[in-house]
Curated annotation (Swiss-Prot):
Keywords: NADP, Oxidoreductase. The record marks 180 as: May play an important role in catalytic activity. The record marks 176 as: May play an important role for the adaptation of the alcohol substrate into the binding site. Gene3D superfamilies: Dihydrodipicolinate Reductase, domain 2, NAD(P)-binding Rossmann-like Domain. Its EC number is 1.3.1.20, 1.1.1.179. It comes from the Eukaryota. The gene is Dhdh. InterPro entries: Gfo/Idh/MocA-like_OxRdtase_N (IPR000683), Gfo/Idh/MocA_domain (IPR050984), GFO_IDH_MocA-like_dom (IPR055170), NAD(P)-bd_dom_sf (IPR036291). This is Trans-1,2-dihydrobenzene-1,2-diol dehydrogenase. It catalyses: (1R,2R)-1,2-dihydrobenzene-1,2-diol + NADP(+) = catechol + NADPH + H(+); D-xylose + NADP(+) = D-xylono-1,5-lactone + NADPH + H(+). It comes from Mus musculus (Mouse). SUPFAM superfamilies: Glyceraldehyde-3-phosphate dehydrogenase-like, C-terminal domain, NAD(P)-binding Rossmann-fold domains. It is an enzyme of class 1 (oxidoreductase). The record marks 71, 79, 97 as: May play an important role in coenzyme binding.
Amino acid sequence: MALRWGIVSAGLIANDFTTVLSSLPSSEHQVVAVAARDLNRAEEFAQKFNIPKAYGSYEELAKDPNVEVAYIATQHPQHKPAVLLCLAAGKAVLCEKPMGVNAAEVREMVAKARSQGVFLMEAIWSRFFPAMEALREVLVQGTIGDLRVARAEFGFDLSHIPRATDWNQAGGGLLDLGIYCVQFLSMIFGAQKPEKISAVGRIHETGVDDTVSVLLQYPGGVHGSFTCSISSNLPNTAYVSGTKGMAQIQKLWAPTELVVNGERKEFPPPVLGKDYNFVNGSCMLYEANHVRECLRKGLKESPVVPLAESELLAEILEEARKAIGVTFPQDKR
């Protein structure tokens, strides 16, 4: 039976996710509604993807009885109200990353999902790529021995994108790009809470974090580190080293190859749909299918991206951000 999706926002990432859903068998996924704050945008989006309902408010979509799961694709400062709205209406929710601007927002969303008994998941799509699944298998098998250190880097020059440097919209590198790095380290070290978090960084003239390096000390004497930047291009790779070798991931946010002890294995993206805004956009299908599987099993959260880990990721990002002196308007609410 098809999973019935409602798309909240008609932006770029919503376009890519809907392109994927529309390319999958209609017996598995159907997009039944889209909502944007501008009805014209919602109607254009609906026309493009042949979606039966277009709404000019998120409230209308939340009330639509035909919507089974809402995909929240707004900018991250708008995630919390949209998520709470849909959860209150009894909709399952897949929310884009980062789920919230700070840990308090994420905790509030998680608490609401649990009190409502409704499914909620942070859309950390990278975790579902076959290359990342293969890396997890490498760790389980002990191929690289006992873990010692992991590192991730993610940086692009985004200074030409107004949202990236907008303090009111919680711009900056940590929330936009750092989430990919910290989720990688958390995956490697089993979602443990770091014993110590330290950070150094450069603050942009608008007050957002520009380029930040973070060191995470984990139990057992192992550690991870990452650097993210919105003003410079970085290698955008990640690696984990152990007593018997090293595994490397290219394109950390959308990986299609894994190198283990010098042996390279490629995982080509599926040929599905076209005209994506983001690299390897067709790979969103792995995440979509995971949500369907979770809901068909009656799960209230994902075993791959559990809610407690989403809370932890938000705590780490907030602590790192405040360590370099960056606070956002949302922190005062």
